Amino acid sequence: MYLRKPIQKIKSEVQIRLIRYYTASENAKVTYHEEMQNNFIATNIFQKALLTCGSAVIALLDPHRGDMIACLGEVTGENAIKYMHSKMLQTEEGQDILKNKPRINSKTIAFETLSQMPENSLGRVYADFMKDNNITADSRLPVQFIADPELAYVMQRYREVHDLVHASLFMKTNMLGEVTVKWVEGIQTKLPMCIGGGIWGAARLRPKHRQMYLKYYLPWAIRTGNNAKFLQGIYFEKRWEQDIDDFHKEMNIVRLLKK
């Protein structure tokens, strides 16, 4: 069983049940397959090639163009997404994710409740990260160019847990933190977009950050990507109450930075 020991407080138990009920009831309103069908845009090989070239150029010129980065990830990531899907099928936890297809947004996650959980819980770490960095869980674009609903969900899941990976690794949202997380994700998911982001993003680092990156962050990211459990197959929503130190130990993550 992948669930870990809950925090032994009645208040926390009530909070956890509310979070899970809220998540389940919202997810029941519309299936992911229905949403995917509404968002899907069919493309041929020529159109995919144009999208690949265009999105890559624009993303390089302006790393803040999330729409172009998302597009690039979809049109270049087919083999990597199939790999991610196969990795998720290898564990009970990953299978549960693929079966339930949970979503992470402001309608499915009670962030106010998470923010009241014990300080060292995964849920609190995530809520504090989102608040401190002024991030909304609704900022992740829907998948548009992947025809297979199962693979489309895997890509959607990758996007929606990205901030959770940031938070659980204690990585900031600045360029240094983003590049570091991209390397961890790239090693684990094999997504060309992540690997490219790690390479090209590093070229944009300022001298001081570049020195820190080469000496500390890059070696740590490579070790973490190779040694940690497959983070895309972790059912974070069922672990809100888990102590972050216990989470790191279970995931085989050696912390680079303190919270």
From Swiss-Prot:
Zn(2+) binds at residues 162-163, 166, 178. The keyword Mitochondrion applies. It comes from the Eukaryota. Pathway: Cofactor biosynthesis; ubiquinone biosynthesis. Its EC number is 4.1.1.130. InterPro entries: Coq4 (IPR007715), Coq4_euk (IPR027540). One of its GO terms (cellular component) is extrinsic component of mitochondrial inner membrane. It is a peripheral membrane protein. GO terms for biological process: ubiquinone biosynthetic process. Keywords: Lyase, Membrane, Metal-binding, Mitochondrion, Mitochondrion inner membrane, Ubiquinone biosynthesis, Zinc. It is found in: Mitochondrion inner membrane. It catalyses: a 4-hydroxy-3-methoxy-5-(all-trans-polyprenyl)benzoate + H(+) = a 2-methoxy-6-(all-trans-polyprenyl)phenol + CO2. Its cofactor is Zn(2+). Belongs to the COQ4 family. This protein may be expected to contain an N-terminal transit peptide but none has been predicted. HAMAP family: Coq4. Lyase that catalyzes the C1-decarboxylation of 4-hydroxy-3-methoxy-5-(all-trans-polyprenyl)benzoic acid into 2-methoxy-6-(all-trans-polyprenyl)phenol during ubiquinone biosynthesis. Component of a multi-subunit COQ enzyme complex. This is Ubiquinone biosynthesis protein COQ4 homolog, mitochondrial. It comes from Bombyx mori. The lineage of its organism: Eukaryota, Metazoa, Ecdysozoa, Arthropoda, Hexapoda.
